[in-house]
């Protein structure tokens, strides 16, 4: 800037220049900054703007008790002035300024307590963007500047200039340039390869990213050109003036001639008036643009903000083309102080559970200075769809990842954010239509929360919605289910599966539906993981109807009948277990079947058929767990079914009847399929079925028209039974 150059060229008699050595640690830090390559050099501007904002905060605070402090300048603002001719970038504020002692102490001779700690962190691979936390953010100026000049004026002292090219020392002198009134001007003499930071587009981009919500106006001064219509003579005059300016810069003194030309031009103008021809010329002017017009909406009172304002802010924050579904705006005060503005989007992103993608849904600010947008410590994974802003008053500026993980403040903020999100969901649940939209998009997140978040499991379980055997096309909450429970019903019954139709027609729900007991249909894969953690709701245990030991409400007479049936079919159960060997753990008489002859249930702590299917579908599954989790199958038979009764008679008549073995295996394999399991050897099962079809159609096994290949296959199969037993086979069928 011209005024600075003048002051630097003053003779030594008029001003005293004092030279100071940097304190050893600061010199070391500057050397580290200058000689190491950092990709995110842009943070220098954030640091300087933050420093300006702090200086403005201080003068504003002082003026509250003494308004005369602002007599030296009432406006509180920050200006950014790029100068391409001088290759400088200047940041000016009207803050508190610095005295001579402040300049010497703050910028060089007294190391901040964090200087050494920061250097150690930096050498250990920490990110340079955390520098502000250690109180040495000013030195980031040397990431882009070869020389830095600081001109400052404090109300209690004269105007001083500080300057250093980072060679181990700095100078301080009285500044006789243009009076500032009050404040600080930081002039960065940029390195040759860092001129991008004089570009309007780049400055705007950095300010929007890091300092958009600083509480004071940030104005960018840019020299621009515009077309101006003038007469020929005016155009010539302009050209002459530009030539004179060039001569001046080269050291040629031609001032008298400029005055003559100017006066002649004015006389000519008066004489000729509008007769001159018009001509368009390029005129340079300084354009001033405020870069942070979007005021931090979260600092305002929620009662004063309209839905439209929230909507506009949400769209500018997320670039979403749709309106948000719900919003929660709150502040926490007391020992800890922070504000938050949280939004629920209308739809879930397609990559919601993509682990490798960095989430940048929550922007973390510290005293309105942007810190980071991918702070995973703020929210648990199941709330990764929440968008918004968190602004803390207590966290240190530019906090590092390592410190975040140990920060007690952050843990308290996180706890409060989760609590407020759950409040928001419960408020949303009061509006059935909106909650339906929310649940369609984010039900998986709620269920993941139940699996992961033990502290909030109860509150999350109240948000669950399911189809049931009594709800029709409407999803109901567990609370609704409990209000409809029968008097003697102790448990909440549920079944997991692939589709609503599949579970509704399942053999497992037959007796429950017959007795008018409501069954919850869980048809999403994540439900399996959810119910592993959700053991009970409002004192009622959740019971899977596909597992062993199902207890149904029954009177004494029913219990007595069941015991009689167990005794009657005890022998058949033993025979079937001997035939199936290790395929099943046990064969028992069922209390859950009505129309199906048999079904396969799993042990209480083993996987359900649905869970087994989910695990098998996982590409990176651990096969070692498949053995002990999936093997515990129990075959339950229906004592009231004609197939089972006839099979009992057949087995008791002749224990060695070959057809009994074949029929038992066929029943078992069919039960596997109908219970949701997959067959280990589907081809063998298919061949058994084809043989049954042949018997049903009366096709003779020895018929020469039978295809040779199928005959070869059937030779490997155990025979169904002798020809003389065909009629009995058909009877069973």
Curated annotation (Swiss-Prot):
Belongs to the heat shock protein 90 family. Residues 730-733 are annotated as: Essential for interaction with SGTA and TTC1. HAMAP family: HSP90. NCBIfam families: PRK05218.1. Its EC number is 3.6.4.10. A motif (TPR repeat-binding) lies at residues 724-733. The TPR repeat-binding motif mediates interaction with TPR repeat-containing proteins like the co-chaperone STUB1. It holds the Pfam family HSP90. Its main location: nucleus. It catalyses: ATP + H2O = ADP + phosphate + H(+). This is Heat shock protein HSP 90-alpha. Residues 683-733 are annotated as: Required for homodimerization. The modification Phosphothreonine is found at residues 5, 7. GO terms for molecular function: ATP binding; ATP hydrolysis activity; ATP-dependent protein folding chaperone; nitric-oxide synthase regulator activity; TPR domain binding; unfolded protein binding. ISGylated. S-nitrosylated; negatively regulates the ATPase activity and the activation of eNOS by HSP90AA1. It comes from Cricetulus griseus (Chinese hamster).
């Amino acid at each position: 800037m011209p005024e600075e150059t003048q002051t630097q060229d003053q003779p030594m008699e008029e001003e005293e220049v004092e030279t100071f050595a940097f304190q050893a640690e600061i010199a070391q830090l500057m050397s580290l900054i200058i000689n190491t390559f950092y990709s995110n050099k842009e943070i220098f501007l954030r640091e300087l703007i933050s420093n300006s904002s702090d200086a403005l905060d201080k003068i504003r605070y002082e003026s509250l008790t003494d308004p005369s402090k602002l007599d030296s300048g009432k406006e509180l603002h920050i200006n950014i002035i790029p100068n391409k001719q001088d290759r400088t970038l200047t940041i000016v504020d009207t803050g508190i300024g610095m005295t001579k002692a402040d300049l010497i102490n703050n910028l060089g001779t007294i190391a901040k307590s964090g200087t050494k700690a920061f250097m150690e962190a930096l050498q250990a691979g920490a990110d340079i963007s955390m520098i502000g936390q250690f109180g040495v953010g000013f030195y980031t100026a040397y990431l882009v500047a070869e020389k830095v000049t600081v001109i400052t004026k404090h109300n209690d002292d004269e105007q001083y200039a500080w300057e250093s090219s980072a060679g181990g020392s700095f100078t301080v002198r009285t500044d006789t340039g243009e009076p500032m009134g009050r404040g600080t001007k930081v002039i960065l003499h940029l390195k040759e390869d860092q001129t991008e930071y004089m570009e309007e587009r780049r400055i705007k981009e950095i300010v929007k990213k890091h300092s958009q919500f600083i509480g004071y106006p940030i104005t960018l001064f840019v020299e621009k050109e515009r077309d101006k219509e003038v007469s020929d003579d005016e155009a010539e005059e302009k050209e002459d003036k530009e030539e004179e300016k060039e001569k001046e810069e080269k050291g040629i003194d031609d001032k008298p001639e400029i005055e003559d030309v100017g006066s002649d031009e004015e006389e000519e103008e008066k004489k000729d008036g509008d007769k001159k021809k018009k001509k368009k010329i390029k005129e340079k002017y300084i354009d001033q643009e405020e870069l942070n017009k979007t005021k931090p909406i979260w600092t305002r009172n929620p009662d004063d903000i309209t839905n439209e304002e929230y909507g506009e802010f949400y769209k500018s924050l997320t670039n979403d083309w749709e309106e948000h579904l719900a919003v929660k705006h709150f502040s926490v005060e007391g020992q800890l102080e922070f504000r938050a503005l949280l939004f629920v989007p209308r739809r879930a992103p397609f990559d919601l559970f993509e682990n490798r993608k960095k989430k940048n849904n929550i922007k973390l600010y510290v005293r309105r200075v942007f810190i980071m947008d991918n702070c995973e410590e703020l929210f648990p994974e199941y709330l990764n769809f929440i968008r918004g802003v968190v602004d803390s008053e207590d966290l240190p500026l530019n906090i590092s990842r390592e410190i975040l993980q140990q920060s007690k403040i952050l843990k308290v903020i996180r706890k409060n954010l989760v609590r407020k999100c759950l409040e928001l969901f419960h408020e949303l649940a009061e509006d059935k239509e909106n909650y339906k939209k929310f649940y369609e998009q984010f039900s998986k997140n709620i269920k993941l929360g139940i699996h992961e978040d033990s502290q909030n499991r109860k509150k999350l379980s109240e948000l669950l919605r399911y189809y049931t055997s009594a709800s029709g096309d409407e999803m109901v909450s567990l609370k609704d289910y409990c209000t409809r429970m029968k008097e003697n019903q102790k448990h909440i019954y549920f079944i997991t599966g692939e589709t609503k139709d599949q579970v509704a027609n399942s053999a497992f729900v037959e007796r429950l539906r017959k007795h008018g007991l409501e069954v919850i249909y869980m048809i999403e894969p994540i439900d399996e993981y959810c119910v592993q953690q959700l053991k009970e709701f409002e004192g009622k245990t959740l019971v899977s109807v596909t597992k062993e030991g199902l207890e149904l409400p029954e009177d004494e007479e029913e219990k007595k009948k069941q015991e009689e049936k167990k005794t009657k079919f005890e022998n058949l159960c033993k025979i079937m277990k001997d035939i199936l060997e290790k395929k099943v753990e046990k064969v028992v008489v069922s209390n859950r079947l009505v129309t199906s002859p048999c079904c396969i249930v799993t042990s209480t702590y083993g996987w359900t058929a649905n869970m087994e299917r989910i695990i098998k579908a996982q590409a990176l599954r651990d096969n070692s767990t498949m053995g002990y989790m999936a093997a515990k199958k129990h075959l339950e038979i229906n004592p009231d079914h004609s197939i089972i009764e006839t099979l009992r008679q057949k087995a008791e008549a002749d224990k060695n009847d070959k057809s009994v073995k074949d029929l038992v295996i066929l029943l078992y394999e069919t039960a596997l399929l109908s219970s949701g399991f997959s067959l280990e050897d589907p081809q063998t099962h298919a061949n058994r079925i084809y043989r049954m079809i042949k018997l049903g159609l009366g096709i003779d096994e020895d018929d020469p028209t039978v295809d040779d290949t199928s005959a070869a296959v059937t030779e490997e199969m155990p025979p169904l039974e002798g020809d003389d037993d065909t009629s009995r086979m058909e009877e069973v069928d």
